[in-house]
Amino acid sequence: MRSLKIILLSSAFNGLTQRAWLDLRQSGFDPSVVLFTDEATVCRQIEAADADLVICPFLKDRVPQQLWSNLDRPVVIIHPGIVGDRGASALDWAITQQARRWGVTALQAVEEMDAGPVWSSCEFDMPAEVRKSELYNGLVS
């Protein structure tokens, strides 16, 4: 039985991407990392790698349709928001609205942003007067 081929598709090898990479390594996987440059290049790299699963821990760009529409190779977005929260600036919203609880949601990429099936979620109590970087690099990661 061959091991699951996992690619981390990310805009940068930031703290959350590093954490995902490390956790996957510690779980016995050998994930590859593809940094998002342009749509055509990213699609070529992922197709050539013959990945079974693409995980996007930190992505500023939309997942190309060529990738999310392939049901044999799911693309999972790590969204720094609770189930039902959609769109950019989720952490900014949680902080400015002084949300008492927040979370992280792993959801499958589909045509509509942050609207796919939820694979997993985790909620946490929001610390008082937390900075975005503290939240992102701490509880979210």
What is each model feature region?
Residues 6, 31-33, 75, 104:
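Hydrophobic anchor at the start of a short beta-strand
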Residues 28-41:
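A short beta-strand-loop structural module common to alpha/beta enzyme folds
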Residues 42-50:
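Short amphipathic alpha-helix with an adjacent loop that forms part of the alpha/beta core around
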Residues 9-13, 36-37, 52-53, 57-58, 74:
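Structural motif
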Residues 17-18, 42-43, 62-65:
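Short, well-ordered alpha-helical microsegments
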Residues 2-24:
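N-terminal beta1-alpha1 ligand-phosphate binding loop
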Residues 59-141:
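Donor/substrate-binding cores of folate-linked one-carbon enzymes
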